[in-house]
From Swiss-Prot:
Taxonomic path: Bacteria, Pseudomonadati, Pseudomonadota, Gammaproteobacteria, Pasteurellales
Region (Disordered): 91-129
Similarity comment text for this entry: Belongs to the LEA type 1 family.
The protein's name in its UniProt record: Uncharacterized protein HI_1339/HI_1462.1
Bias type Basic and acidic residues, positions: 91-114
Organism per entry: Haemophilus influenzae (strain ATCC 51907 / DSM 11121 / KW20 / Rd)
Length: 129
């Protein structure tokens, strides 16, 4: 009987310990579930914020690149205008030089023809004397 009493007492103590531990485990489990929910919500919020920040950075980079491209295009257009202006000025200068050379040549030819005509007239006058 004593053995039975020891066994019953032991069973009662162990049962009580299990009940107490089980209650603590339930509360602890609830707390862990709540902590896990908060952690998941926090991670989701951080992920959402990080994605939003990344999208903002991408938009800013795209705008900066767009501005850079516009500026480069404007610079190239200005460079092209300068080259065209220089080429036009050079061509205009060359045309002016060619006109001047042609005018000089025409004057020389006119003088030569005039001189030849004068010589011919003088020759005719001398021949008729």
């Amino acid at each position: 009987m004593e053995k039975i009493m020891k066994k019953l007492t032991l069973a009662l103590v162990l049962g009580s310990a299990l009940v107490v531990t089980g209650c603590f485990d339930k509360q602890e489990a609830k707390q862990k579930v709540e902590d896990t929910k908060q952690t998941v919500a926090s991670v989701a919020s951080e992920t959402k914020d990080a994605a939003a920040n990344t999208m903002t950075e991408v938009k800013e980079k795209a705008q900066q690149l767009s501005t850079d491209v516009k500026n480069k295009v404007a610079e190239k257009v200005e460079d092209a205008k300068e080259v065209i202006k220089s080429a036009t000025e050079a061509a205009s200068e060359k045309v002016g030089e060619m006109k001047e050379a042609a005018s000089e040549k025409a004057s020389e030819m006119k003088e030569a023809v005039s001189e030849k005509a004068t010589q011919a007239v003088d020759a005719v006058k001398e021949a008729t004397k």
